[in-house]
Curated annotation (Swiss-Prot):
Gene name per UniProt: GPR4
Sugar-bearing residue positions: N3, N164
Positions of the record's site feature: Required for activation: E145
Protein name, as recorded: G-protein coupled receptor 4
Pfam families: 7tm_1 (PF00001)
SS bond partners: C9-C258, C90-C168
Family: Belongs to the G-protein coupled receptor 1 family.
Length: 363
């Protein structure tokens, strides 16, 4: 891979060496544990044959892969945009970093469309809301986004400027093929999914407004969920794509015009850093989108808190962090029956629990 010196634009990498790494450190600290928890909860939903869990699990996996690249980007910005880890790692981590943006947008779009079908056409498109269908759609998303964003892997992505800074996945001004690829990313990777999300939101609003059986509180929750999907994409990704489109359009109109690149350099880096907030917003979205997920997450957090605050950690570990089994479920059912005035005869293994009513107390 070549990394020769080129006479590019004069961009001052010192002006933004604090904000992006600070934001990335925050995302690592918050996004890593919350996405691990979301991944576990999504897996539980998939085991319950919930197709929504498939999309949420893939979203968590993409976020975790992205978070794993952030320590090297923190180091990159702290060294004033100077990549010191070699060309191979630049290609790999840059590829994961930028591809995650469009994988996340695609899965947010899948969630939005899935919710539209569930609310507006619960019976008509029931076959499209099966786990097998969600797995197939997720496979197509991964294959499409990985393939579409793999072009930089076949080009040089390390560039050394006149000040001996080695840029990774950045060149000012950009190259011609990069400008055209950016247009594809903006219109196909960002605007098209966002348009589908807007249409889904409109369809959800019409379906909810016309439903007489849905309670007002439930209608508000559905609207809030659909709007939160659109807001995540708009807040996290729109500023970056506005600047990406502007840089690409200016280059295609006036190649090697450094004035615009130098003016937007700091804003561009800040908008790129803002895309990482998606990894913090996604787990919050996960709790909003699924009632069972909220219950799973709340139960896990409660058990973890009890474990951390218990005087007997080993006892709490065995008592609080044990997953339900058929046997423990039976025991819990028996306990609830006794509390309600029922007595359960001790069941043998594989037998059903036999319940007998207590006789009324003697007068």
């Amino acid at each position: 891979m070549g990394n020769g010196t080129w006479e590019g634009c004069h961009v001052d990498s010192r002006v933004d060496h604090l904000f992006p790494p600070s934001l990335y450190i925050f995302v690592i600290g918050v996004g890593l544990p919350t996405n691990c928890l979301a991944l576990w909860a999504a897996y539980r939903q998939v085991r319950q044959r919930n197709e929504l869990g498939v999309y949420l699990m893939n979203l968590s996996i993409a976020d975790l892969l992205y978070i794993c690249t952030l320590p090297l980007w923190v180091d990159y910005f702290l060294h004033h945009d100077n990549w010191i880890h070699g060309p191979g790692s630049c290609k790999l981590f840059g590829f994961i970093f930028y591809t995650n943006i469009y994988i996340s947008i695609a899965f947010l779009c899948c969630i939005s469309v899935d919710r539209y079908l569930a609310v507006a056409h619960p019976l008509r498109f029931a076959r499209l809301r099966r786990v097998k269908t969600a797995v197939a759609v997720s496979s197509v998303v991964w294959a499409t986004e990985l393939g579409a964003n793999s072009v930089p892997l076949f080009h040089d992505e390390l560039f050394r400027d006149r000040y001996n800074h080695t840029f990774c996945f950045e060149k000012f001004p950009m190259e011609g093929w990069v400008a055209w690829m950016n247009l594809y990313r903006v219109f196909v990777g960002f605007l098209f999914p966002w348009a589908l999300m807007l249409l889904s939101y409109r369809g959800i609003l019409r379906a909810v407004r016309g439903s007489v059986s849905t309670e007002r509180q439930e209608k508000a929750k559905i609207k809030r969920l659909a709007l939160s999907l659109i807001a995540i994409v708009l807040v996290c990704f729109a500023p970056y794509h506005v600047l990406l489109l502007s840089r690409s359009a200016v280059y295609l109109g006036h190649p090697w015009d450094c004035g615009f690149e130098e003016r937007v350099f700091s804003a561009y880096h800040s908008s790129l850093a803002f895309t990482s907030l998606n990894c913090v917003a996604d787990p919050i979205l996960y709790c909003l989108v699924n009632e069972g997920a909220r219950s799973d997450v709340a139960k896990a957090l409660h058990n973890l808190l009890r474990f951390l605050t218990s005087d007997k950690p080993q006892e709490m570990a065995s008592a609080s962090l044990t997953l339900d089994t058929p046997l423990t479920s039976k025991r819990n059912s028996m306990a609830r029956a006794v509390a309600a005035g029922w007595v359960a005869s001790p069941p043998s293994q594989g037998d059903q629990v036999q319940l007998k009513m207590l006789p009324p107390p003697a007068p």
